[in-house]
Amino acid sequence: TIGHGAIIHARVIGPEASIGMGAVLSLCSEIGAGSIVAESALVPQGKIIPPETLVAGVPAKPLRELTDKDRTDWRETKDWYVRMAAQCLDPDNYHPVK
């Protein structure tokens, strides 16, 4: 998933990776599968983030490897966003502002 306001110039974003709101992925950076880039993080040009890693900061630095709890929590959050998007697209759910 990619949070709103993120700027993406990365060469690769691996499957199941999550990019936080306002994060910047500079030219030729690579984000490994399942990694999490924190909100407002700056991944420098050419930086390679290993799979299953949490990174944060300016410049982004690895904080730790992801835990099973991280993976479960992020999966649930992503699923929630998918449900909310589907709900917004449902014409029966449309309520015009009066």
Model-flagged regions — what are they?
Residues 1-2, 6-7, 24, 52-98:
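C-terminal segments of enzyme domains that contribute to small-molecule binding surfaces
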Residues 1-55, 59-62:
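Structural signal for interior beta-strand "rungs" in well-ordered beta-sheet cores
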